[in-house]
């Protein structure tokens, strides 16, 4: 909200509460406040009860200075008396005891007025017995009838309510920049609200040394429990709360989530002041971590160049080489070239037709730093070579390496040729085969169980269909399902020959050239085509 919007909101609220003198009251506020921008914004968001109290104070000040407003009768509550209404001087307000005694017409009105007087720093007469027994009515409070019955916690202009406070807990507490539903801040007064010298949100605000020392000791204790492991600044407040049962708090600091739109010490700046025992470590993507100073040397540094392949290892003795594929130098040539920088322990270049990278390991990490500091390019046997720092292998690549599909499964040569022919089937057949689940249905399982252990199909023995390695049952079931789909096509017929000799049933398949259906020998074959005579 800018200054113009805040002025419009304040003027509208004054016009609603005091329509007769709205222009004079609003003009007085503009003239007498030194820091008008901030004061107007605070007035725009203050409760109605506070706005009514401010209006009454301004009315009395205008009446006293210009004599255009007359003092209220003696049976009314005397209006608070104070000096000039400026932001730099705190309010000095006193209320004299009333002359008449009476009763409170409504306890809610009493609480509302007491809150208003406390907010304006009214002094001892508020707590005196004479003041508490005074006679007040809605008309004698100088407040409109509609405002006295209105909840003071409902501001006229909507404010941003804290989402986490509504859910039950906000770790920022009273320092949260959003509205927590409180009527009046506990540590604020009317003088603090309109004081231009208020430095709570100033960047130069000094953090208390006692608070800083206490916070440092608590963070050190928290880091020692981690045994040298760093803690990210994003998770530090929550870990601090779980450990000590309170929010991470130091006078004058704001967390990183609170910095947007509001000045103040960020948590990063606050921890940077603890240089003797705590170190801040840069992390990828702009994050920061905090670690004990004694453990900082053991931590992997992320200050160098970063990419998706991983982080640069601190103290690494390897370098990464890239070069054109047409280069012809050998590992021995690379070793001779880099020996001029330091002792070379190992050179690795993959044995590929188009090799384009390699690794060199040195005896000392200082040699690596010297080579990287020299820069690129390097020339080995007239080939341009680029040197890059060795990076740690990322977790994602390790995960993929552990879950690579099984390779090296060899099948019989004849079956491989037949498998190629199967892949040339019509789309209707091939799609139905590939879309089948790896598990067989019950009819297919019954057929597969009825097949003998040794059988021949299309001139191939059953050994050609066996895997040379121990394949999983799912692979076997999928192969058998694929085979059954192929056999059930209209262009292929499976010929089964059944023989009842020795009560054994055997299946014989003819080759693709012979499409003749051979019926098995039957003991009733002699009766075929003849009449069967019955013997009586």
Swiss-Prot record:
Q: Which CDD domains match?
A: RRM_AtC3H46_like
- The segment(s) forming the RRM domain are 317-392
Keywords tagged on the record = DNA-binding, Hydrolase, Metal-binding, Nuclease, RNA-binding, Zinc, Zinc-finger
Q: Please provide an example of a Pfam family that matches this protein in its UniProt record.
A: RRM_1
- E.C. designation(s): 3.1.-.-
Q: Which residues form the HTH OST-type domain?
A: 211-294
Broad class of enzyme this protein falls into: hydrolase
Query: Zinc finger spans (C3H1-type)?
Result: 156-183
Its protein name is Zinc finger CCCH domain-containing protein 18
């Amino acid at each position: 909200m800018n200054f113009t919007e805040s002025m419009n909101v304040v003027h509208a609220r004054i016009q609603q509460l005091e329509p007769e003198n709205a222009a004079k009251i609003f003009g007085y506020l503009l003239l007498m406040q030194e820091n008008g921008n901030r004061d107007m914004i605070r007035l725009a968001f203050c409760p109605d009860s506070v706005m009514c109290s401010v209006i009454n104070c301004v009315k009395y000040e205008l009446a006293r200075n210009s004599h255009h407003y007359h003092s209220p009768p003696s049976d009314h509550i005397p209006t608070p008396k104070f000096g000039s209404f400026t932001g730099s001087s705190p309010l000095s307000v006193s209320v004299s005891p009333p002359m008449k005694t009476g009763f409170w017409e409504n306890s809610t009105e009493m609480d509302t007025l007491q809150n208003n007087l406390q907010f304006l720093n009214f002094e001892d007469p508020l707590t005196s017995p004479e003041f508490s027994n005074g006679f007040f009515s809605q008309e004698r409070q100088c407040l409109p009838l509609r405002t006295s019955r209105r909840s003071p916690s409902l501001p006229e202009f909507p404010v941003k309510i804290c989402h986490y406070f509504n859910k039950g807990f906000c770790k920022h507490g009273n320092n949260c920049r959003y509205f927590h539903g409180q009527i009046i801040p506990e540590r604020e007064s009317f003088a603090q609200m309109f004081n231009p010298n208020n430095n709570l949100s100033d960047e130069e605000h000094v953090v208390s040394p006692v608070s800083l020392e206490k916070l440092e000791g608590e963070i050190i204790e928290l880091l020692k429990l981690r045994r040298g492991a760093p803690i990210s600044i994003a998770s530090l407040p929550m870990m601090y709360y779980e450990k000590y049962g309170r929010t991470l708090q130091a006078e004058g600091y704001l967390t990183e989530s609170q910095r947007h739109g509001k000045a103040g010490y960020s948590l990063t700046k606050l921890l940077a002041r603890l240089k003797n025992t705590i170190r801040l470590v840069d992390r990828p993507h702009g994050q920061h971590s905090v670690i004990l100073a004694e453990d900082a040397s053991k931590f992997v540094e992320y200050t160098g160049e970063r990419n998706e392949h991983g982080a640069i290892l601190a103290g690494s003795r390897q370098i990464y080489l890239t070069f054109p594929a047409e280069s012809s130098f050998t590992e021995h040539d690379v070793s001779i070239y880099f020996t001029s920088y330091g002792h070379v322990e190992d050179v690795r270049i993959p044995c590929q037709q188009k090799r384009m990278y390699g690794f060199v390991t040195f005896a000392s990490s200082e040699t690596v730093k010297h080579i990287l500091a020299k820069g690129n390019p390097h020339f080995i046997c007239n080939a341009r070579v680029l040197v890059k720092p060795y990076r740690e292998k990322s977790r994602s690549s390790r995960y993929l390496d552990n879950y690579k599909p099984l390779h090296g499964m060899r099948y019989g040569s004849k079956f491989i040729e037949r498998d190629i022919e199967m892949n040339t089937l019509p789309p209707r057949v091939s799609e139905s085969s590939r879309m089948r689940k790896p598990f067989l249905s019950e009819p297919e399982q019954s057929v597969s169980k009825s097949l003998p252990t040794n059988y021949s199909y299309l001139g191939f023995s059953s050994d050609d269909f066996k895997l040379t390695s121990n394949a999983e049952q799912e692979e076997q079931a999928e192969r058998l399902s694929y085979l059954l789909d192929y056999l059930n096509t209209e262009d292929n017929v499976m010929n089964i020959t059944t023989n009842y000799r020795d009560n054994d049933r055997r299946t014989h398949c003819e080759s693709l050239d012979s499409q003749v259906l051979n019926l098995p020998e039957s003991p009733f074959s002699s009766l075929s085509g003849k009449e069967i005579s019955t013997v009586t």
